[in-house]
Design a protein with these regions (language model features):
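Conserved acidic segment of CheY-like receiver
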Residues: 1-18, 26, 46-47
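Short, aromatic/basic amphipathic alpha-helical patches
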Residues: 14-22, 61-62, 86
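A structural signal for short coil/turn segments at secondary-structure junctions
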Residues: 22-25, 41, 66
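A structural preference for short, hydrophobic beta-strand core positions in alpha/beta folds
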Residues: 26-29, 73
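Acidic, metal-coordinating helix/loop segments flanking the phosphotransfer/catalytic sites
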Residues: 28-45
């Protein structure tokens, strides 16, 4: 499984969990993730690990390019769940997340 991790900061714990699921490419900018998908084809999943407006910007970049890629937004702010639906994220999780939640 090819996974794109979109996050401005290094998230060691979450990255380690994702690496158990497949190959992880990390991007600190949603635009760079889109460029990678244009060059190398779509990812099986894009995981956004940013809160608030930063997370929303990542979602908008990814959804602006592809409505088909599986999009997971992980935030520590539960109040952004309605925005995740509006931005068509497939899944919204509140930190901390478990390996079990990521596998679902």
């Amino acid at each position: 499984m090819r996974i794109a991790l979109c996050s401005y900061s290094q998230k060691e714990k979450e990255t380690a969990l994702l690496m158990k699921l497949g190959k992880v490419d990390r991007f600190d900018n949603g635009v760079f993730c889109v460029y990678a998908m244009q060059r190398e084809g779509p990812y099986d999943a894009v995981v956004i690990m940013e809160d608030g407006a930063r997370g929303m910007n990542f979602c908008m970049s990814i959804r602006g390019y592809s409505r088909d890629v599986q999009l997971l937004w992980i935030s520590d702010q539960a109040e952004f769940e309605p925005q995740s639906r509006r931005l068509q994220a497939d899944t919204f999780l509140v930190k901390p997340v478990t390996e079990y939640q990521l596998r679902e």
